[in-house]
Amino acid sequence: MAALFLKKLTLQTVKTENYCIRRCLGKYILQGPAPTQQPPRPSCLIHAKAFSTEDTQDEMTKKKKNETAFSSVGRKINERIIHVLDEQGNDLGHMHRANVIRLMAERDLRLVKRDASAEPPQYQLLTGAQIHQERLRLREAERAAPKPGPTLTKELTFSSNIGQHDLDTKSKQIQQWIEKKYKVQITVKKGKSADEPEDKMEEMCNRIVQTMSGIATFSSRPQPIRGGKAVMCVLRPLSKKEEAAWKAAPDTPRRDALNGGDGKDGASGVLPQ
């Protein structure tokens, strides 16, 4: 009996000691480290495409080029009924796309779009060689077409006592520039001869234009510069409208070229309207 009581007392003492230890040291043992302040986390960066009309225009240009490119559409015909021409250019009339695809397989032909704005759209059956030749033709036409851009100006200076041979050489150079759609600024300096006529410099400008009737005219009439020691004028190519007017009046090209111009850039007034 005494042994049982002693055992209970011992267990009670151990429990009391454990409780006191947990009470005194529990906050140091069980308590985790104090949270440290974390640096601010940057927000997630999302790449956003900048707004630009240029990108849209580029995409539209590429799409337009793809639409206008001369190539076979294959079997992807969006319209049910189309207007068809054969490889010889003969009109086959309106056909269902299924019949067109069957005709392509029978004759080993390709289908290209000719006029998408027509109703129904117009297509043509061509051989591979015909498509290749048409592409070459379109490429050559594109190269030959004038490139849009600012008009460049060439400059040429010479003396009024220049020899006839040298003057002819310079006139040919001016003509080559005009044919390439350049403007040409001509400056004629007064010669050293004392008995030289006052209007000789202006007359030389008129003579140059006279040799180029039908291709060039004055953009700026001859005007004295440098205190009358030189004369300057500007020549430009004829516009398409002026070329047509010149061809319609072939008997007066020289007179028109000599009498034209009002002294202002971009206005000639040389051809009959």
Curated annotation (Swiss-Prot):
Organism equals Bos taurus
Q: What is its main location?
A: mitochondrion
| Gene Ontology cellular-component terms listed | mitochondrial matrix; mitochondrion
Keyword Transit peptide attributed: yes
Q: Which GO terms describe its biological process?
A: mitochondrial translational initiation; ribosome disassembly
- Which residues lie in Basic and acidic residues bias regions? 252-265
Q: What task does this protein carry out?
A: IF-3 binds to the 28S ribosomal subunit and shifts the equilibrium between 55S ribosomes and their 39S and 28S subunits in favor of the free subunits, thus enhancing the availability of 28S subunits on which protein synthesis initiation begins.
Residue ranges annotated as transmembrane are none
Q: Which residues form the propeptide?
A: 33-92
Kindly provide the name given to this protein in its UniProt entry. Translation initiation factor IF-3, mitochondrial
In chain numbering, the transit peptide falls at: 1-32
Q: Where is this region: Disordered?
A: 242-273
Concerning PANTHER family, the annotation shows:
TRANSLATION INITIATION FACTOR IF-3, TRANSLATION INITIATION FACTOR IF-3, MITOCHONDRIAL
Which keywords fit this entry according to its UniProt record?
Answer: Initiation factor, Mitochondrion, Protein biosynthesis, Transit peptide
